[in-house]
């Protein structure tokens, strides 16, 4: 089923010039980038985006990492895009990520794990609309 998902290339990966490699890996696995832009999150924007994690032990570190430099936000489209993107990324902890996954190849640590991806259709819609207006997203089909 053709669907859309949301992806972030995090500051740790942007700083290390990994944008191209990460996008290539997504495209080679059947996902199309249908919207993309580079932004620098303020602390308030990061807290708003990650509000569901407020109060968790890792929240402050997450906000610090996500505001440490620019990020690349993207809308991806493809068959089962949410599950496919999560498979390509690998689990949050790069130590547990399979060979060939983005996090295994590029993550520095569990906190600096290079990428974020939506985990459900509801999250994808919310996350896409947080960063993109409808006129900024183009269908690949």
From Swiss-Prot:
The active site is at residue 116. Major role in the synthesis of nucleoside triphosphates other than ATP. The ATP gamma phosphate is transferred to the NDP beta phosphate via a ping-pong mechanism, using a phosphorylated active-site intermediate. This is Nucleoside diphosphate kinase. It holds the Pfam family NDK. GO terms for cellular component: cytoplasm. The lineage of its organism: Bacteria, Pseudomonadati, Pseudomonadota, Gammaproteobacteria, Thiotrichales. It comes from Hydrogenovibrio crunogenus (strain DSM 25203 / XCL-2) (Thiomicrospira crunogena). SMART domains: NDK (SM00562). It comes from the Bacteria. Its EC number is 2.7.4.6.
């Amino acid at each position: 089923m053709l669907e859309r998902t949301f992806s972030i290339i995090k500051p740790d990966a942007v700083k290390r010039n990994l944008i191209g490699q990460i996008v290539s890996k997504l495209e080679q696995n059947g996902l199309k980038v249908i919207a993309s832009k580079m932004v620098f999150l303020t602390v308030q924007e990061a807290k708003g985006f990650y509000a569901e994690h407020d109060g968790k032990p890792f929240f402050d570190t997450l906000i610090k990492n996500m505001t440490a430099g620019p990020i690349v936000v993207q809308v991806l489209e493809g068959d089962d895009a949410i599950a496919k993107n999560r498979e390509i990324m690998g689990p949050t902890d790069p130590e547990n990520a399979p060979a060939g996954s983005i996090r295994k190849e590029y993550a520095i640590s569990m906190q600096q794990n290079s990428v974020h991806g939506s985990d459900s259709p509801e999250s994808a819609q919310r996350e896409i609309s947080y960063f993109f207006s409808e006129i900024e997203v183009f269908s690949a089909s």
